[in-house]
UniProtKB/Swiss-Prot annotation:
Cofactor: Mg(2+); Zn(2+)
InterPro entries per UniProt: DNA-dir_RpoC_beta_prime (IPR045867), DNA-dir_RpoC_beta_prime_bact (IPR012754), RNA_pol_asu (IPR000722), RNA_pol_N (IPR006592), RNA_pol_Rpb1_1 (IPR007080), RNA_pol_Rpb1_3 (IPR007066), RNA_pol_Rpb1_3_sf (IPR042102), RNA_pol_Rpb1_4 (IPR007083)
Protein name as annotated: DNA-directed RNA polymerase subunit beta'
Subunit structure: The RNAP catalytic core consists of 2 alpha, 1 beta, 1 beta' and 1 omega subunit. When a sigma factor is associated with the core the holoenzyme is formed, which can initiate transcription.
GO cellular component, one term: DNA-directed RNA polymerase complex
Entries under SMART domains matching the protein: RPOLA_N (SM00663)
Residues reported in the UniProt entry to bind Zn(2+) 2: C877, C954, C961, C964
Length: 1299
């Protein structure tokens, strides 16, 4: 099955100038794009046909060669190869740079890889690269050492000369002054003139001294600099550098810009540097050691790969193919072009100008400026805006550089590689199709015809309705009658996929068998709305067509809606009757006392139905009916002598009989009222005990009965159904009094504001509850609103309370509860003030929903990313470890009751060891799937806890094994090998996240009686846990077992533990207002929480170890979801938590090839240690690391997966430097490169199957007569000839396509 083009690794590396020239088909020398007159590409320009290939198929530039027959010829006139135009999508060019430039990713990225390698601060590196400082690239230390005495002598002589010159100049001036003064004396000049002469001479002397001292100082400076000169020294003073070079240029070399970096890299000794750094790490400490560790990572990357560090400095820039940066003509004759063309043009312009300046021999300062501009042009081409101000286009918009083409949601990875638009798909509005079966959907005729067009056309030709494809196409476009018949034939048993966005879990795409319908809307079965979260208020759905037989088979077997009855998150049914169906079935099965025909006895069901039709009998009257094939329910009292299979006279109602007729014949009789809970129990039971076909058929029966009887029930809502309780004013008056009393206490200063608020909130919550209760008691059982809520069809009591009772307390925009309630109900109408404060909460609810939906979607994306490579890879990893899970707990009276969370903990797991009762009898063997039945048996036998296999203890090196994962909740059977359990886990956690976010919406911001937690604790808390962040107001946990003492001071409290083992005391400073969970002198256990508040999972890991940290995270996450009434199975959370603890931080590397401080995959760490120990060397030591899901996703072994997730440029920079290979084990990597994903049927164990004949078959192959054995040819004719008959072809089933 494996194709020739398949490959198992994808490596990324640093490209050198040679590589770039090797990829290139020619050098781009001109900045021109196309000729605006002829609209043809300019020669040697950015779209040149000679370099990138012809712009028209099989046609050269000058037109000498046209047509495919000249394929492969290179035109001697224009130099263009005659080939397909699509080569312009793959052929690259290059620009030869006149001066090297550094790659901005390696110099400006954080951390700066170049800086780490050369041990330079990024600031200094920037000075060198952008021509602000010179860098010494080499020093001839030997000759300098030899010559130093001579140079010292020369220096001293020069210095002495300068001193002598200065002294002689000063002496000359002094002499001249004396002469001048003598002359003035002789002339009898005034004292002022003499002073003037003296001052002038003093000034001259001072100038001479100053100049000479400066020269001497400069000489000293140059000499000192030269004496101590070493490689990598920077010199920002150009004058000083020039002098240094003029005097001592033969002993050192220095330069500016990328050339300096290049020279350094050429002479860089990686091995020596690595040894030096390892030495520092072994013996150093503090800052120095940390920096050495970081530098060693970079040095090691170049040492262990074939990458050359010279790849970080470019001598040539690749030019990507022109079709990837197109230029298109708009309607007005103007051109729209990709930003890359502008950026390339700037590079070429500056490069050409630099070449010209170099040819002209321009002054160094001008050349350097041009080189700096070239560097900046290449920087903005690679990553515009990374350094300095971004280059902008028209309208001050920053241009999109090569990096921007990869980054973000619109980048290459997420837009084109991970998400593609597909052919054979369509979308339309959905409407309800109550007449459909569960596995069907209604497909509009026109849509179906368009989707199946190629198939219809081929079939028309096969059936001779059309001569060729062209005429068949014409027939289809004209909607000829034969077309519909053919379409009908083609779509039978050809499933289609329906998808509704947002696809939050795998049930968002399901397969259906299409039924052609009139109109333009897709018809959807009402029972699958829950899975799609669809309603019919204008939702749209997309249709996709599985084409290959394999795809159709998968759609039919795995994705058909009747095979997706269970929810993957908790294994409970998702296709439940809802709304109208519930009302119908509730109406059918309600008991009504005193109605027509009560107490009568009927000989058969048909007789009862006849009585009902004649209005002699009410649907809900209690009567006795003789039933055939009655399967008794628990608690039915059988008459004497009755045996199963006989008819039975049963006390029931006609509605109950009709309801039971919808269930399978051998299903126990259901006497309960069919409300939402009962229906859920029935469907759950059906899914657990019956084949899927039966379950699907039963669901359809329930749907049909539900809709029919909902119509017959005539349930409506009128304003008169809303009955406000008459006792309301009295109740309110009583609570008003109590509230006034509290307010009075506050006014007197007896209580503070916080206490007043708490008390008032408590009072009004009680009032609200009391009114709600009175209101419920007042509603008659036949009140339609009561029936809707009681049956679970729609709405809840909180909403009814707001309509008919009291609106209650509401929150303000900050989320604080306002301690004055809204006393009116909506039936009575709100006052202006009440209406105003009510709108706050409602508006906040809507705003929150919008914000938190985005957050939840992002959480799902991160969860998928971290767990996408968790696939079931093997049957059994062979571990003996597991988790101990409770199945029963003692209640207040000491009696055993089923643990409330057993459905999401022990259920659907594999038992790790035999479960044995107190007498030693094995109740369930290890390896048994722990379903509802097993749990019930164990509970009956008094077992309180079981040890089950878990993903957390699985020892598979990649992915997980089937037994540790247990039952697949979506199918109810043990998970298949190849199941992508990681993605299912992420979807199961993320999908309710979105529901959580939307929960505030329906209640209009009213506060539930429990003072309900809004999901503001919910979603942010889930994110905090999965990102392993330290929460706000963190509570310390005891690091050792011992006695605790509480020491109080003015500002804070200190909790001091004296450990039992006699080690030194441990103190925890906490705020004075903290609520303590311990008392002075109490004994605390390791890991015990000391004050009220959230615990930091990293502390749990450090103090109590990985197992405790895993359990803590699972329990906390489940706590948030359960508080919102959402059930997710523990195993999903465990899959994610396992991914968070997959890595180990290496502390000491021992003699392994791991680096200290490195984050290593646990399996790699253990393999390395095993190898080292087997050679008798010292293994590495490490500590388990808890990583948040974002960090874990970015730290994955697969660079393709990490780059397509976040921080694309950073990931690619690092991966290229390390020469990383992607083993293509996860799903994302394979989607990106377009390979079949290694999950499900894409696993090698399914695709790479070879069939070998058995020894027996091989033996049989050669036992027949050979060509050389004595074979009598006479048997073919003559007397004894066997008779040959012609067999009519119709006897063979050669399939419909044979003719």
């Amino acid at each position: 099955m494996s194709s020739e083009s398949s490959f198992g690794l994808m490596q990324i590396g640093l490209a050198t100038a040679e590589d770039i020239r090797g990829w290139s088909y020619g050098e781009v020398k001109k900045p021109e794009t196309i000729n605006y007159r002829t609209l043809k590409p300019e020669k040697d320009g950015l779209f040149c046909e000679k370099i990138f290939g012809p712009s028209r198929d099989w046609e050269c530039y000058c037109g000498k060669y046209k047509r495919v027959r000249f394929k492969g010829i290179i035109c001697e006139r224009c130099g263009v190869e005659v080939t397909r135009a699509k080569v312009r999508r793959e052929r690259m060019g290059h620009i030869e740079l006149a001066a090297p430039v550094t790659h901005i990713w390696y110099f400006k990225g954080v951390p700066s890889r170049l800086g780490y390698l050369l041990d330079l601060a990024p600031k200094d590196l920037e000075k060198v690269i952008y021509f602000a400082a010179y860098m010494i690239t080499s020093v001839d230390t030997d000759s300098r050492h030899e010559e130093l005495p001579n140079l010292q002598v020369e220096h001293d002589i020069e210095k002495k000369q300068l001193v002598d010159n200065r002294d002689s100049d000063i002496a000359t001036i002094a002499r001249d002054l004396e002469n001048e003064l003598a002359r003035l004396e002789g002339e009898g000049a005034k004292a002022a003139d003499k002073k003037k002469a003296r001052d002038s001479a003093d000034r001259q002397m001072a100038n001479v001294r100053k100049r000479a001292d400066a020269d001497i100082e400069r000489l000293e400076q140059v000499w000192d600099r030269f004496k101590n000169l070493k490689v990598a020294d920077l010199e920002g003073d150009e004058g000083l550098y020039r002098e240094l070079r003029d005097r001592y240029g033969m002993y050192f070399e220095g330069s500016m810009g990328a050339e300096a970096i290049k020279k350094r890299l050429e002479n860089f000794d990686m091995q020596a540097e690595s040894d030096l750094l390892r030495d520092i790490i072994a013996n150093g400490k503090g800052q120095r050691k940390t920096r050495a560790l970081k530098r060693l990572k970079v040095v090691n990357a170049f040492l262990t790969t074939n990458n050359s560090p010279l790849g970080m400095v470019l001598d040539a820039v690749p030019v990507i193919p022109p079709e990837l940066r197109p230029m298109v003509q708009l309607d007005g004759g103007r051109f729209a072009t990709s930003d890359l063309n502008d950026l390339y043009r700037r590079v070429i312009n500056r490069n050409n100008r630099l070449k010209r300046l170099l040819d002209l021999g321009a002054p160094e300062i001008i050349v350097n400026n041009e080189k700096r501009m070239l560097q900046e042009a290449v920087d903005s081409l690679f990553d515009n805006g990374r350094r300095g101000r971004p280059v902008t286009g028209p309208g001050n918009r920053p241009l999109k550089s090569l990096s921007d083409m990869l980054k973000g949601k619109q980048g290459r990875f997420r837009q084109n590689l991970l998400g593609k638009r597909v052919d054979y798909s369509g979308r339309s509005v959905i409407v309800v199709g109550p007449q459909l079966k569960l596995h069907q959907c209604g497909l509009p005729k026109q849509m179906a015809l368009e989707l199946f067009k190629p198939f219809v056309m081929k079939r028309l030709v096969d059936l001779n309705h059309a001569q060729n494809i062209k005429s068949a196409k014409r027939m289809v476009e004209r909607y000829r009658p034969q077309v519909w018949d053919v379409l009908e034939e083609i779509i039978t048993e050809h499933p289609v996929l329906l998808n509704r966005a947002p696809t939050l879990h795998r049930l968002g795409i399901q397969a259906f068998e299409p039924q052609l319908v009139e109109g333009k809307a897709i018809q959807l079965h009402p029972l699958v709305c829950g899975a799609f979260n669809a309603d019919f208020d204008g939702d749209q759905m997309a249709v996709h067509l599985p084409l290959s037989p394999e795809a159709q088979a998968e759609a039919r077997i795995l994705m058909l809606s009747s095979n997706n009855i269970l929810k993957p998150s908790d294994g409970r049914p998702v296709t439940l009757p809802s709304q109208d169906m519930i009302i119908g079935l509730y109406h059918l099965t309600t008991k009504r006392v005193g109605s027509a025909g009560e107490g009568r006895i009927f000989s058969s069901v048909s007789e009862a139905i006849m009585a009902f039709d004649l209005h002699e009998l009410h649907l809900n009257s209690q009567v006795k009916i003789r039933l055939e094939g009655f399967v008794p329910y628990a608690g039915w009292e059988a008459p004497e002598g009755w045996e199963p299979g006989q008819t039975a006279l049963v006390q029931t109602s006609l509605g109950q009989v009709i309801f039971n007729q919808t269930l399978p014949e051998d299903y126990p009789w259901v006497e309960a009222v069919a409300d939402k809970g009962e229906l859920s129990r029935i469907v759950n039971d059906l899914a657990e005990r019956y084949p899927k076909v039966v379950t699907a058929a039963t669901l359809d029966n329930l749907k049909d009965a539900g809709f029919y009887w909902a119509t017959r029930s005539g349930v409506t809502v009128a304003i008169s159904d809303i009955e406000v309780p008459a006792e309301k004013p009295v109740i309110l008056a009583g609570y008003e009094e109590r509230a006034a009393k509290i307010q009075g206490q506050y006014d007197k200063g007896l209580i503070d504001d916080d206490e007043r608020r708490q008390e008032l909130i408590e009072i009004w919550n009680k009032a609200t509850n009391e009114i709600a209760q009175v209101m419920r008691d007042n509603l008659s059982p036949m009140n339609t609103i009561n029936r809707m809520v009681s049956s679970g069809a729609r709405g809840n009591w909180m909403q009814v309370r707001q309509i008919a009772g009291i609106r209650g307390l509401v929150a303000n925009p900050k989320g604080e509860i306002i301690p004055r309630p809204i006393k009116s109900s909506y039936r009575e109408g709100l006052s202006v003030l009440e209406y105003f404060i009510a709108t706050h909460g409602a508006r906040k609810g809507l705003a929150d929903t919008a914000l938190r939906t985005a957050n939840s979607g992002y959480l799902t994306r991160r969860l998928v990313d971290v767990s996408q490579d968790v696939i079931v890879r093997e049957e059994d990893c062979g571990t003996e470890r597991g988790l101990v899970t409770p199945i029963a707990v003692a209640d207040a009276n000491g009696e055993l009751v089923l643990d409330e969370n057993v459905e999401n903990s022990a259920y659907a797991r594999t038992l790790a060891v035999d479960v044995v009762d107190s007498k030693g009898k094995v109740l369930a063997a290890g390896g048994t799937d722990c379903g509802d039945v097993v749990i019930a048996e164990l509970f009956a036998a008094g077992i309180t806890e079981v040890k089950v296999r878990s993903v957390l203890t699985c020892e598979s090196s990649v992915g997980t094994c089937a037994l540790c994962y247990g039952r697949s909740l979506a199918t109810g059977k043990t998970v298949d090998i190849g199941e992508a359990v990681g993605i299912i886990a992420a979807q199961s956690i993320g999908e309710p996240g979105t529901q959580l976010t939307m929960r505030t919406f329906h209640t209009g911001g009213a506060v539930s009686a429990s003072g309900g937690d809004d999901i503001t604790q919910g979603l942010p808390r889930i994110q905090e846990l999965f990102e392993a962040r330290t929460p706000k107001g963190v509570a310390p946990i005891a690091e050792a077992a011992g006695r605790i003492a509480i020491e109080e001071s003015e500002r804070q409290m200190r909790l001091v533990i004296t450990p039992d083992d006699g080690s030194e005391e441990i103190a925890y400073p906490v705020l004075r207002r903290s609520r303590l969970l311990i008392e002075d002198g109490q004994h605390v256990a390791v890991g015990q929480k000391l004050i009220n508040g959230p615990v930091d999972p990293k502390q749990v890991l450090r103090i109590m170890g990985p197992r405790a940290a895993q359990k803590f995270l699972v329990d906390e996450v489940q706590g948030v979801y359960r508080s919102q009434g959402i059930g997710i199975h523990d195993k999903h959370v465990e899959v994610i938590v396992r991914q968070m603890l997959r890595r180990v931080t290496v502390i000491e590397s021992g003699e392994s090839d791991l680096l200290p401080g490195e984050l290593a995959e646990r399996s790699r760490f253990e393999d390395a240690n095993r190898r080292v120990v087997s050679e008798g060397k010292t293994p590495a030591s490490g500590r388990p690391e808890l990583m948040g899901i974002t960090k874990a996703s970015l730290a994955t072994e697969s660079w393709l997966s990490a780059a397509s997730f976040q921080e694309t440029t950073r990931v690619l920079t690092q991966a290229a430097m390390e020469g990383k290979s992607d083993p293509l084990l996860g799903l994302k990597e394979n989607v990106i490169i377009g390979k079949l994903i290694p999950a499900g049927t894409g696993l090698p164990r399914y695709t790479e199957v070879t069939v070998e004949p058995t020894e027996e078959a091989k033996a049989n192959l050669f036992t027949g007569p050979s060509a050389f054995s004595d074979f009598s040819y006479d048997t073919l004719g003559g007397d004894g000839a066997p008779e040959f008959h012609a067999i009519p072809l119709d006897d063979y089933d050669l399939g419909s396509d044979f003719r």
